[in-house]
Structures are given as structure tokens and as C-alpha cells.
UniProtKB/Swiss-Prot annotation:
Record keyword Oxidoreductase present: yes
Localisation: Cytoplasm
Family: Belongs to the gamma-glutamyl phosphate reductase family.
Cellular component GO terms held in the UniProt record: cytoplasm
Underlying gene: proA
Single Gene Ontology BP annotation: L-proline biosynthetic process
Domain of life per record: Bacteria
Protein name: Gamma-glutamyl phosphate reductase
Pathway the protein contributes to: Amino-acid biosynthesis; L-proline biosynthesis; L-glutamate 5-semialdehyde from L-glutamate: step 2/2
Signal peptide: none
Primary localization: cytoplasm
Amino acid sequence: MDATTIDLEQMGRAAKTAAMTLGQLTTLQKNTGLLAMAAALETHADTILAANKADLAAASALPEKFVDRLALTKARIADMAAGVRQVATLDDPTAQTDRAWVNEAGLTIAQKRVPLGVVGMIYEARPNVTVDAAALTFKSGNAVILRGGKEALHSNLALATVLQDALAAKELPRDAVQLITDPSRAVATQMMHLNGYIDVLIPRGGKGLIKAVVEQATVPVIETGAGNCHIYVDAHAQLQMAVAIVVNAKVQRPSVCNAAEKLLIHADVANEQLPVIAKALQDHGVELRGDERARAIVPSMHAATAEDWDTEYNDLIMAVKVVDSEEEAIQHINAHNTKHSEAIITDNYQNSQQFLQQVDAAVVYVNASTRFTDGYEFGFGAEIGISTQKLHARGPMGLAALTTIKYQVLGNGQIRKN
């Protein structure tokens, strides 16, 4: 159900009805729907590209990195379809029993995974999120209400229509996937207050969007992360490894949330290693902003401000700080990070364990790039987002994160005696 004059409660009722049906589908039925959606994306690629062309024309004055995320090609649509097919191969969490036991009264208690119900998504101008969210929610037995960025409205509408038609052709609920076509903030705010219809709301986008949803929503929210990610080069770090990891984490895709934004380096190795790491970054076009001690070693750095330590750049910019101890590095990270992904480079086992235990983040790495924080890399398949909160789900969220627990208890007439 789509509407130009939005009746969100009507959409919510339709989603609830669809969710009841989805919760009863077999894994085979859900996979059939997913394969139909994947095929439809490929069949209707020209229609989707025409809609995307309209969005791109309106966005021509926006920054290049924004336009790149918005743009679709036949290859990107093929990748979307492949992603949907890959979701079809994943284990269905709702077909599993987590554990079962018999209690002292003879009751058989089974802990099962069940769908959340209706998932709401508020996200920026990334058409791929429309498809990823539809595939993951459908496989996990949830209905989804999507509200994408206004810059991608034509693309999202084309994609949602293709997915809905594919489901309907297989006699599956069309309202399993619904798109809000009014991009106004007023409607977004109304969506955030759709208690009784939306079971959980997941924002995906920049810090401002996520902050607005977390602060304004009255429905439960899973906070997905802005990524102010750090790499700490310990006193026992191998230089070659440090260069490779830092460059990969910063340069490969600087606009994504798992890119590194800050470099901390121990004073004992800073004079030797920082000039080499800095040159490698600068050779890739990275602007470095250092504290006073870092600039004394690499004078070409710009001066870092207090604001820099809390900024997610999403760009080829990195702030650098020299620290005197691992404890200082950990304190700095915990004071300024967004609880997303943090890494230490070290050959010292004790230091690695201290970092793993004391850094407060969804994902903590030893001798690896923060770029691995991703559903595919973790073996979850596509992800609905990367949670930086601690309740319900944390880190890359795959299918299991879109379910909750139900206890099924079987008896033969037992009554409680006390």
C-alpha cells in the first residue's frame, strides 16, 4: 500500500495483517518470494534505472559521494538481486529452536525465535537499503514500512513496486513491503509515533538522522551507528601491519560507518612509525589533523581542534593523537567513540586482551581493519544495520536480530502447587 496522501495508521494496519500471514509462512514459501523478488529486479531493471535517472537529475548539485550512493546501474541492480538470492540461502531463524528442557514439574519448555512483527525503516538516499530491508524482513517473517530519503523517492518507489508485484504474483502479501511516499519531516515524525503498529524502528544514515529518531521516537528504536572509529597503534605494533591496516580502514571507503576516523599512536613508536603511516595516508589524499605532539613529528599535519575528536568525517580526513600509554588510548576512545568499531595493532598479548576487555564498542579488533564490521563479512548475509546500542541487538544485524524469543511450554495437566 502506497499513498500520496499518507494514512500511516492504515499502512500500519495493513502491515500488521501482512505480518500475521508472514509469521505462518514456511521457509520454502519465504524463499520462493525472495527468488521472485530477485528475478523481478533484473526483469524490470530498465524501469528502475529510468526512475533513478530522475532522482540523479534532481541531485546533480549535491556532493559526489552522495550522488554515488544514490546512483544505480545495471551492475548494481544485478548485485541487489544477487543479495536477495543470497538471503534466500541463509538459515531461517524462525525455523529454529534455540534450546529446550524439561523442568521439575515435567513441563517441556522450548525457546523459539519468532518475528518482531512490523519493522519501520527511516533511512537516507540509498536505494540499496530498500531492497536489503525488504529481503531481510521478509525472510525473518516481518512486514516492513520504509521511509527513504526524498532524494531517492523515484528510485525507492520503483523498487518497492517491483518487489510488491513480485510477491503478489506468488500470492504472498503485497503489504509485506510498504513505502511511505511523502518525504516530509512531519510524516517521518508521525511514523516515529506509530505505537501499536510498528514494533521496532531502525534508522540508517548520518548522525543527525539517527539522533533525531532516537530522541523523538516513541516506538522502540534500534540505534544504528555513526562510526567515529579509532585505530590504536600500540608500542608493540609491527610497522608494516600498521600501515596496511590504517590505510585500508581510512582509504578504502571513507564515507562508510566502519571507516577509521582517528589514529592513536603510542609515544614509544611515534617518532619511528608515525612519519611512515602519515606518508602512506597522505599519498592516498588523506588530510591529517594532529595534536601538538603529532605535528611536532609530522609538521605537514593541520592542527586538530577539540571538535575533531568527536567528528565522523565520512571523508579522506583523519585526526591523529600521540598517547603515553594504552590506558590513555582506551580512555580517549571510550570518551569520544560512537560504540561502533575500534582496533588495536599490537604483538603484545596482554595489551590486546586489555583492549578487548576495556574498550566499549560493538566490535573490537586486534590486528585487523575496522572495515570488517559488516554483515557479509561476519557471515550473516546482508545486514539491516549496525547496532551501537546494548539492548536486543549489537553490531551487524542479520536475520536473527529481526526476531525475538517466545517460550512454548507443553504440559499434561500440571498445576503450580506453591
